[in-house]
């Protein structure tokens, strides 16, 4: 079930494949902020940047 999956991708081709399959995608690439990745669930330039975001404490619920 695509709604229960997450792809972490480092190429535009892989990003397109995941998007075509209806799978949420996080992009890790130097050009991740490029407009072609705007539909990504997350965009990071490096793996450490993603790992830092994942380890951050979530904001308190209001």
Predicted regions and their residues:
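Asp-based, Mg2+/Mn2+-dependent phosphohydrolase catalytic module
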Residues: 1-62
């Amino acid at each position: 079930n695509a709604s229960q999956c997450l792809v972490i991708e480092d190429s535009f081709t892989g990003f397109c494949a995941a998007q075509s399959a209806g799978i949420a995608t996080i992009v890790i690439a130097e050009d991740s902020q490029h407009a072609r990745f705007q539909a990504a669930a997350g965009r990071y330039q490096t793996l450490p940047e993603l790992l830092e975001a994942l380890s951050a404490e979530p904001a308190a619920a209001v």
